[in-house]
Amino acid sequence: MSYEAHVTDTAYCYDGSFAGFLCCVFESYARKEIPAEVCPPEEGQLNFFGTRQIFTDEQHARRVAAGLDRLGREVKDRVTTGFLCTDPGKDLTLLRFVRLCFAQGPRAAQMLGDPDAAAAFALERAVDNEACRLIEFIRFEERDGMLGAVIHPKHRILPLLRGHFCSRLPDENFLIYDAAHGTALLHRDGQVRYLSMERYIPGADETELDWQRMWKRFFKALTIEQRRDEKAQMSHVPKRFWQDMCEMQPDLAFPAGADVRKAD
């Protein structure tokens, strides 16, 4: 295919940022080549490929970004959302898809018979699907005077959660901590920031724990033990999400003297 250019045995290594990825696209055009691999820092590099370090140049990144803007929303969303995927090899997949789009125009997003277009579509769908599911199952709790939630997603989905929660909780201060990737989405006083975090220290206070105990009792009261089907449950709520859902955790003991009524 004409958009492939010359395939080399060189791996591009870059800083892992989206701007850095756009610079890899720029370098690919400047050298009229397709790299054998595109490696962010977390993936390292394969020893049997020669390597070329691609440094982030904001001017180069802006030129490629402007080109994506001209290709339309569908193409741009596929690239930006697909970039949040953590599957190995996604960087090279997206670079090849961008080249296809520049060669074929916006219609390339619909060319799912092309392996590069199909692979980019699969990346976008994987990220979107996980974000949609987590929107339903995120559990906030009161932590250190604000709402806090911990998640362990496979992909870096925080940017896709931003619009949903900021529009529905505009007057709340909240933090969503992605423990799998060490990042957090902070909404405070109407402003949004992304933070790097190694851990989320503040724990739930006793009032919050009381609410969690009551919610767990309510959840348990609705359960019909004879009809429990864990396989069906996992088909609706993947088990990897359970660790962040209070109702799926072991029972919390009520403090001494608490007014505990049996849930029938």
What are the roles of these predicted feature ranges?
Residues 2-58:
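N-terminal ordered "arm"
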Residues 10-17, 52, 115, 146-157, ...:
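Conserved aromatic-histidine-acidic binding/catalytic patches
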Residues 20-31, 95-103, 163-167, 213-220:
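Short, hydrophobic/amphipathic alpha-helical patches that form generic packing surfaces
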Residues 39-132:
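Charged, alpha-helical interface segments at or near domain boundaries
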Residues 53-62, 191-204:
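Acidic, Ser/Thr-rich peripheral helices and adjacent loops at domain boundaries
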Residues 78-83, 179, 228-234:
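Short coil/turn segments at secondary-structure boundaries
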Residues 107-198:
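Internal, well-folded beta-alpha domain core
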Residues 173, 184-189, 199, 203-264:
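Long, compositionally biased intrinsically disordered terminal regions
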